[in-house]
Amino acid sequence: MTMTRRTWLLVPVLAALAACANTSAPSSSTAGAASATPGSTPAVTPFAAAKPPKLIVFMVVDGLPIRQVLGYRDQLQPDGFKRFLDRGAWFANAYYGHGYTVTAAGHSIMLSGAYPERSGIIGNEWRDPMTGAPQYNTADPRYHYIGNKTEPLAGTSPENYKVETVGDVLRTLQPGSKMIGISGKDRGAILPSGHKGTAYMFMGSSGQFASSTYYMDKHPAWVDAFNAGKPADQFFGKTWAPMLPESAYARSVPDGQPWQANSGNGNKLPAVLGAGMDGPGPRFYGNILPSPFGDELTLAFARAAVEGEQLGADDQTDILSVSLSSHDYINHAFGPESRLSHDHFLHLDAYLQDWFKYLDAKVGRDNYVAVLTADHGFTDTPEWAKSQGRDAGRIVPAQAVGFVNAGLARQFGEGRWVIGMSGTGFIFDEPLIQQRGLKQDEVYEAAKALVVQVDGVQTAFTRAQLAGTDTTTPNLAQMRHSWYPGIAAPLQVIPKPGWMFGSRVMGTTHGSPYENDTHVPLLTWGPKWVGQGRIEQRVEIIDLAPTLSAILHVPAPRQAQGKLLPLPAK
């Protein structure tokens, strides 16, 4: 197969081995963090004594907070999530240490061990702070999807990803190893795959899974065969029905609330996919991911990848990353407190049980290590939170920008000083600042003094603060981890806990430095490599990459900022 990807230069092996020694130092955000009860920290697994597994199965559930895993634990299947919770090792206090917790940032961290301050993946999309031009995290106009339409700013390559991953290091040292990334979202497939892997993502226009010409000129036969079967069409007319009796959902918010959005399938169960449509087509395919069937379809493609690529079939370790996107779509529309989210989680658990049974039979229980985490958590829907007596709400971006511009006009003269938002940051009319003979930092500081007066805003940090060394101001270290000079906005704004930017009184989101968004599952299983137990010690998701590298007997990615996870000895 002719490959068209550009060459990705990795450091020489000896340099990488030397860099690996630096990964044992704790990151700045974990140093001094709350630790486990004295005497409860498990011994580090002696990975060097165990032969590397044939396959690493890296699972991501997009938008899954740990509170949902533990809150519904009593309703789980015996061998889905409970495989990790009852027979694996899992971390009760696993956090992201960066402040802007969104999908691309989370996926960029997991297998690189590097924060956005190093990777350059500061968000899903951002605007150039000098020109305001939009940039998507994995957009690259030089490449297109294979056999599918490529929209402007579609994710097609890891060009913007400035670091290497565990898979990149593995494939440099062992070219026969394979690194496959699969997801309902382009960013969920591309970023974990790194620069040397191969990514496949769901195409909402066709119901297919496709790669891009960054990776290959044409799909392998197994991908064509999967798509030829039109597996997405099987869900047309299928009913999403609750898995359990109504009484089992008493702990979650009922369907049909006024703040719950219509994801394309309504906001009540049971829901029939494709209702009111004549047949499968782009509109229908786009409604699959906001349902449990999006995960079912993604896992079906993952099985096809295991078969087609013969993953885990020889002594060259392979890595399969599968990012399941449906939970994020469902939480955005209905909220993590909703029955729809609760029920989707139970469907997902059943899918995982079937998936692991398949891997046990195909690869062998003693031949693979499984890891499951999330790219971020979720904030409860503000309207529901307020009904529970909590402080919560929405900050309308246009109103916040208008308020700040009015204040800056009074101070510096008429002008559209703030031209918009990039993530939760403000970007400015830089030529106007220069024309008026003003210093940038003077304008940024003035804007900060104004924006903190907006209802729902907790604080804001200027470029000078983010480039500084202050380690005492709350949330500053987290936002510094999310800030990349020349890419990120020069004024970063943080809403209060429970608040979010948004102009629609519907649905909810994530993206804050608070526990709801940063506290995620970190679950591991692998009988020959990992012991069992709940670990209380606080850890960060940046610790995953060095740990997986140790299991694989390869150096950690050279930009990794984490340390080895304190996994219990086997």
Label every PLM stretch briefly.
Residues 61, 124-155, 163, 193-195, ...:
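Secreted, luminal/periplasmic, and some membrane-associated catalytic domains
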Residues 68, 288-314, 327-368, 444-446, ...:
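A long, amphipathic alpha-helix that forms part
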Residues 387, 395-438, 509-552, 566-570:
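Substrate-binding rim/cap in mid-to-C-terminal beta-strand-loop elements of soluble/periplasmic
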Residues 82-86, 163-172, 423-461, 527, ...:
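Non-catalytic, well-ordered alpha-helical segments in soluble enzyme domains
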Residues 38-52, 66-164, 171, 185-205:
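Active-site nucleophile/metal-coordination loop of metallo-enzymes that catalyze phosphate/sulfate
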